[in-house]
């Protein structure tokens, strides 16, 4: 999450609520609020997380269910950086200039 804004907008996407499991050895990196006004839980739900499995590293995201979500620069960036970290233990990729802000979604069409 280094270099990413603390708050940023993601394109319209499906929000998973009340994920199952004990969440052992899991670190939540980012959450999204599940608003009661949208029939949500009223809680912040995990969106990006890392887990360990033995000596392995796992990056997990609940984002990316359709074309608008997959086109979001926030999804693209966190997915690329998360998989790089899982594979190497390091993140070398820079945060792009068009990363979303707290008020604006940023998408790529190509």
Task: Please annotate each region the language model reported.
Residues 35-46, 51-110:
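Extracellular ligand-binding/catalytic regions of CAZymes and related secreted enzymes
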Residues 1-54, 95-96:
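Catalytic beta-strand/loop cores that center a nucleophilic Ser/Cys/Thr
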């Amino acid at each position: 999450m280094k270099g990413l804004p603390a708050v940023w907008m993601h394109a319209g996407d499906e929000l998973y609520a009340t994920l199952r499991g004990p969440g052992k050895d899991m670190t939540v990196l980012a959450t999204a609020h599940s608003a009661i006004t949208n029939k949500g839980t009223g809680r912040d739900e995990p969106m990006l997380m890392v887990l360990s499995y033995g000596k392995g590293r796992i990056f997990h995201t609940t984002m990316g269910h359709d074309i608008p979500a997959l086109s979001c620069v926030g999804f693209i960036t966190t997915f690329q950086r998360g998989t790089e970290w899982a594979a190497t233990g390091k993140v070398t990729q820079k945060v792009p200039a068009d990363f979303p802000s707290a008020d604006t979604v940023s998408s790529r069409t190509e």
